[in-house]
Regions:
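Buried, small/hydrophobic-residue-enriched core segments of structured protein domains
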Residues: 2-86, 90-91, 116, 121, ...
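Gly/Ser/Thr/Ala-enriched C-terminal appendages of enzymes
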Residues: 55, 78-101, 106-168
Length: 168
């Protein structure tokens, strides 16, 4: 996007939060990762990933400022119906109309899964869907389910690698 002067689009990678946890400590990882994301991307790429250190932990850091600032959330693991209710509750508690926020559902979705979630959401928020594996591999063979995650990093160019963790 920078090279071609395009508006960047996308969401946080888990590794962003994982790095912040290793560097700054896991108790403050979500809050610092959100703050630094805002500093780096200046309001672009406004869909927040919620599950690096569990969704409940994420929501404890996703205060009113971030809930208003970010365009929405990305569901990437767990039960989409439970997540939807948590997101709706969180926005309402912050006095934000959930219909003004986007949730990107993106965990191993197929067309039937999208229809089921869409029916459940029923216009209570703006729902969009990331169908990767099953859209590009809808030919009747079982897709590979492969996730690659960071397992260590060198904070600020240090000499030693530090372990990182992801909890969903």
């Amino acid at each position: 996007a920078m090279k071609y002067n395009l508006t960047p689009m996308g969401t946080h990678p888990h590794e962003w939060f994982m790095y912040h946890g290793a560097h700054y400590g896991y108790r403050s990882a979500n809050a610092l990762a959100l703050a630094n994301w805002v500093d780096v991307y200046d309001g672009h790429l406004g869909i927040a990933l919620t599950d690096t250190y569990t969704t409940d932990n994420f929501f404890s850091s996703f205060d009113t400022q971030y809930a208003k600032l970010f365009d929405g959330l990305r569901w990437d693991s767990g039960d989409p119906y439970v997540f939807t209710e948590k997101a709706l509750k969180h926005y309402r508690e912050k006095r934000i109309d959930p219909r003004t926020k986007t949730v990107v559902y993106s965990d191993a979705l197929d067309l039937e899964g999208v229809e089921n979630i869409r029916s459940f959401v029923n216009g209570r928020l703006h729902d969009v869907y990331g169908i990767g594996t099953f859209l590009s591999n809808d030919v009747g063979v079982k897709p590979l389910n492969m996730v690659i995650k960071m397992f260590e990093c060198k904070p600020q160019g240090g000499k030693e690698f530090w372990p990182v963790v992801k909890l969903s």
